[in-house]
């Protein structure tokens, strides 16, 4: 519900402040130190992640950064959400 609200807010703000651009980045499970703090055994956690992601792995921070750079550099992208989730959303 919160994610949908953030996306709706971004679209509304994009419409209001155009031609300035507003976008949302929605990452899936990304391999960061925070994942290690989740309390689960790391190997078990990644085994569970691969079951829910079409690409069979967690994402890497650089992949999120590349998508953000793409959105920043493309002046024609606005009011949208970029899902960086390894196909998790599609698999649901």
Outline where the language-model segments fall.
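Alpha-helical segment proximal to the catalytic Tyr-Lys
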Residues: 11, 15-16
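Hydrophobic positions on the long internal alpha-helix
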Residues: 9-10, 67
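Short, small/polar-rich loop/turn modules that mediate ligand/substrate recognition or access, typified
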Residues: 18-21, 78-79
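Conserved loop-to-helix N-cap of the C-terminal "lid" that shapes the substrate pocket in Rossmann-like
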Residues: 24, 43-46, 55-65
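C-terminal substrate-recognition "lid" of short-chain dehydrogenase/reductases
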Residues: 60-84, 89
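Active-site helix of classical SDR
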Residues: 2-3, 10
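A glycine/serine/threonine-rich, flexible loop-to-helix segment
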Residues: 29-52, 92
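Conserved SDR Rossmann-fold cofactor-binding beta-strand/turn motif
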Residues: 21-31, 83-85
């Amino acid at each position: 519900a919160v994610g949908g609200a953030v996306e709706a807010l971004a679209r509304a703000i994009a419409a209001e402040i155009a031609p300035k651009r507003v976008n949302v980045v929605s990452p899936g499970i990304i391999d960061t130190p925070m994942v290690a703090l989740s309390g689960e055994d790391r190997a078990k956690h990644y085994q569970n992640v691969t079951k829910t992601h079409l690409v069979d792995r967690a994402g890497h921070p650089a992949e999120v950064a590349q998508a953000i750079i793409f959105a920043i550099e493309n002046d024609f992208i606005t009011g949208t959400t970029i899902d960086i989730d390894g196909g998790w959303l599609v698999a649901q």
